[in-house]
């Protein structure tokens, strides 16, 4: 039995407060590159067509919709999140895309997924594992929910190496991004973002965390000069 922590509740409330502008700000602040990152992540899941997929921290369903697009009519997606408002936006997007029947939404924390063992072919989480209060438990839950031979795919922000680009990006990430985000949204969500990324483990350490949780053959590769890292594990 898992009880929501104060941090769980705070994260859910924070994202609910920015839900109406979340997609707009994502496109603006990433210059649209986030769509490519999601395409690459979904391409790592199995099977290539059809299948059952779990999307943890589904939010406004960008990842769930990309799964439906790549995997075709035979695929089904279960999206879980703590923010009802974010999922409401996601449901509206799925309806507009004609995917209401293929994507189901459930309110649940990543630390306690309401599914039986081996229920899915693959599980993924995009830019959400940072926000899981008990990260190790969340990874174990994803592994538990995936069948043997399935994939666990994590897409997450990372800190670029200490190059000129890395220094430039860090300035943008820590100083510019929160200001732009603050103009279009209330609250501290875009101040929280750089803080949470800087506190996140380095890629080799997080890959080891995935192995400890139950993933085998874990790989990780940087995308867009290391702004984001794509992690893939086999259950």
Residue ranges of model-derived segments:
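C-terminal alpha-helical "lid/dimerization" subdomain adjacent to the S-adenosyl-L-methionine
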Residues: 9, 155-209, 213, 219
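Core SAM-dependent methyltransferase catalytic element
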Residues: 213-235
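A short acidic, Gly/Pro-enriched loop at the edge of an enzyme's catalytic core
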Residues: 111-122
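A short glycine-rich, Lys/Arg-flanked "PGG" loop and its adjoining helix->strand segment in the class I
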Residues: 136-151
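Conserved alpha-helix/loop element of class I SAM-dependent methyltransferases that forms part
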Residues: 21, 31-51, 66
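Class I SAM-dependent methyltransferase SAM/SAH-binding core
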Residues: 52-112
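Hydrophobic beta-strand segment of the Class I
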Residues: 22, 123-124
């Amino acid at each position: 039995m898992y009880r929501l922590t104060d941090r769980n509740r705070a994260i859910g409330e924070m994202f609910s407060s920015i839900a109406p502008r979340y997609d707009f700000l994502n496109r603006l602040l990433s210059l649209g590159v986030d769509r490519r990152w999601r395409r690459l992540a979904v391409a790592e899941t199995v099977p290539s067509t059809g299948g059952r997929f779990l999307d943890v921290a589904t939010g406004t369903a960008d990842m769930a919709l990309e799964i439906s697009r790549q995997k075709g009519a035979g695929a089904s997606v279960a999206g879980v999140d703590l923010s009802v408002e974010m999922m409401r936006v996601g449901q509206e997007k799925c309806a507009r895309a004609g995917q209401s029947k293929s994507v189901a939404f459930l309110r649940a924390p990543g630390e306690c997924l309401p599914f039986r063992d081996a229920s899915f072919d693959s599980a993924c989480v995009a830019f959400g594992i940072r926000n899981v209060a008990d990260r190790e438990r969340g990874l174990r839950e994803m592994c538990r929910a995936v069948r043997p031979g399935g994939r666990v795919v994590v897409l997450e922000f990372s800190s670029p190496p200490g190059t000129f680009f890395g220094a430039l990006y860090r300035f943008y990430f820590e100083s510019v991004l929160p200001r732009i985000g603050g103009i279009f949204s209330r609250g501290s969500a875009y101040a929280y973002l750089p803080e949470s990324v800087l506190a996140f483990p380095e890629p080799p350490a997080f890959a080891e965390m995935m192995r400890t949780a139950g993933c085998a053959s874990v790989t990780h590769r940087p995308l867009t000069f290391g702004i984001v890292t794509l992690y893939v594990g086999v259950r």
